Design a protein with these regions (language model features):
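Conserved active-site and SAM-binding loop architecture
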Residues: 1-223
């Protein structure tokens, strides 16, 4: 099974993936982050490149594709930023990738992003504050260790307590980045997809997902 993991980061989504004859190609633009990924997953092929362009030129060579394109220009935080005079267009690369895979890709795919400040141009599946575009149904899971991109909760806590919780949740992801340099470790971990969620989605793509193994609160609802 040939898998493409775009915008791979350090591979939070990929951490628990395992199936016979699995070959993962990870694409990450930041060379230092790519080195961490390669160290964590020595059997994966790691490509330092623009994931958006790599996807366009290579999607047809894979059976399963996961994309988590950058989310800042789509996030609801843009309401606050706009009020502060910070104005920016939403990055339409997200929808280019959705249209490409919806129209031409023959395998299974999932594109993940945060819930946007605008009405989505293409109807997604919804989980918490996040949107998913996929050609298969995926279970909605709730884990205490959800953080960063995959966290649908907003704690009403003081800054110190929030920082402590964030540190504890980073540890729960199961990555020890102590020896690595040249990366923003907190940002990298914040951007991680919780490994259990990555596994559940991966198993759903393979039609082997077992809901009894995890806490399940239903299926994604549609807009």
């Amino acid at each position: 099974m040939k898998i493409l993991n775009c915008y791979a980061g350090i591979g939070g989504n990929r951490k628990l993936w395992n199936c016979p004859n699995m070959q993962v190609t990870a694409v990450e633009y930041d060379e230092n982050i790519a080195k961490v990924y390669q160290d964590l997953y020595p059997n994966d092929i790691v490509v330092v490149a623009d994931a958006h362009e790599y996807l366009l030129n290579n999607y047809q060579n894979f059976n399963f594709i996961w994309c988590s394109p950058p989310c800042p220009t789509h996030s609801i935080t843009n309401h606050f930023l706009n009020a502060q005079g910070i104005k920016r267009y939403p990055d339409m690369a997200l929808y280019q990738e959705i249209i490409l895979l919806q129209t031409f890709f023959k395998g299974k795919y999932i594109i993940e992003n945060v819930k946007s400040y605008y009405e989505p141009l293409i109807k997604p599946q919804i989980s918490g504050r996040h949107y998913f575009w996929s050609n298969f149904k995926i279970p909605m899971l709730q884990f205490e260790k959800q953080i960063g991109r995959m966290n649908g909760k907003k704690a009403d806590l003081g800054g110190k307590i929030q920082a402590e919780l964030r540190t504890n949740n980073h540890k729960k992801l199961g990555f020890d980045l102590t020896k690595y340099t040249g990366i923003d470790k907190q940002k990298v971990l914040n951007n991680c997809v919780a490994p259990e969620i990555g596994l559940a989605i991966f198993e759903s793509a393979l039609d082997i997902y077992d809901a009894s193994k995890v806490e399940q609160i239903g299926l994604f609802t549609e807009l």
